């Protein structure tokens, strides 16, 4: 109620409450409405010469003179400016604070607000416990409890399984919950709430009502799913529109894979993201890094003379993905690193998962390898499921669409197309290694049988057998050899000039043989020593016993006549050393070689003719060359 409406002068205030002034002045307790100070406009009382107030009763007599008890003396021009004075200056000598003794007692016994130590909060956060659980434990066992007791209570409570009940009613998650320790008595607790504020234990506030814990409410790890390696810088910068490092994007990405049940999700970010952000690299929601710290791996970084030195975190990402056989979540193609290591290139081609954000929601594609590739479920699993009915490209190897082809190519490993540069490099390497084909082709296509040709034709063997049965036994002369021998002579010339000579050491009528012995005595003795134990029993014609002396009934023509009864090759004939025939064979092979080189590659012709040194038949050599080309292509 206004003081002028009540018809009396304004009061000199010592407190904002009327009841407080009543308790201070015992005179007001007996006459609470009568004592007033006279104002200028309505003189109920007047001031004396020395500034003492005269208290006028209801009948008009002066009750008392002097300052009322509990009130400070005021001058004539020092009325309260709040009521009737136009002066804005308040009373300098008048205290506006409450002098209620009960108020003073309540302020002295107010509860003390104490916060937990930073190391306790950091210790609990790294273990995965929320600040709500830590506040509840410290309110229960006391803020001064030992770390072991705090950990024991946290273990009993368990890890957070879902969203806290009071998370939607809170406002900020930047500071831990204050812990209240009170030593107030029961009398102070029953005092009026208007005299002192009572602070109670409050819960931890969240940055937004939709914020949840770093671990989803339903997390069931699936061992059949691959581990996930997240390029944290790429994800956070894309969520921040490539302007700021948004930690909220990291949390959305982490929750997506944890809800799917991936057993291990690792996020790589540089170490300096934990520090105070600079103006050139802003960070939003930096407190989220503490919430998801269990899944974060900080790559090294340091400051050298005010300059920030950051290690290449992409190498850590690719190396970890190789060790854990994990999927890489990034929109970076790592071209600089795939050129260094072929294994990293294969990882990027086969296990790189791209993504985007749609209204702050992490969203990878359903077909990471293209429209006709595996689905996201098969892509993220350890055992990929291949589509049962893929559409095969009708052009097959002749397809010119390359990577843009929408159909399936079974000849391309893992659906990857070999570029033109890689194909040319591969063909160039094949041409360089073609010099080694000669020896390989020689080993592959040489005759399976021994290089020894037939020593005697069938007709010669038959004639010799008949003559040996008809001849009577005669004592052997001292000039005869102890037994019959067969000798293989090789000329010191090209392989196709090798020939076989059968020599029968017996009586003198074998004139060509004796002449050959006289011409090549040293070679004869050497071959006799080498082949004495090997060749006598090859064909069963000459037995182990020493044969009797034979008269020569085998004609020269019969002995040296060519025969194709077994092998069917005219060059495998029995004959003496003939230099003219060797020259003719070399000429024939040279002519065949010239014509074959006009048809086939020179390397294949050389290798096949070297593997078959006695072959001069052109159709047979052509067949062998074609077979060699087919084997080489396989």
From Swiss-Prot:
Region span, Disordered: 1-33, 90-113, 156-223
UniProt effect for mutating residue 314 to A: Loss of ribonuclease activity
Residues reported in the UniProt entry to bind Mg(2+): 314
Annotated knockout phenotype: Viable, but exhibit slower development and have reduced body fat. RNAi-mediated knockdown results in increased sensitivity and reduced survival in response to lower temperatures. RNAi-mediated knockdown results in increased expression of the transcription factor ets-4 in the nuclei of intestinal cells, which may further result in changes in the expression of genes involved in lipid metabolism. RNAi-mediated knockdown also causes a defect in the clearance of apoptotic cell corpses in hermaphrodite gonads.
Top enzyme category: hydrolase
Stretches annotated zinc finger (C3H1-type): 387-412
Main location, first listed in the record: cytoplasm
Annotated GO CC locations: cytoplasmic ribonucleoprotein granule; nucleus
Biased composition (Basic and acidic residues): 97-106
Pfam families cross-referenced by the UniProt entry: Regnase_1_C, RNase_Zc3h12a, UBA_6
Identification of the protein by name: Endoribonuclease rege-1
Organism from which the protein derives: Caenorhabditis elegans
Classification of source organism: Eukaryota, Metazoa, Ecdysozoa, Nematoda, Chromadorea
Gene of this entry: rege-1
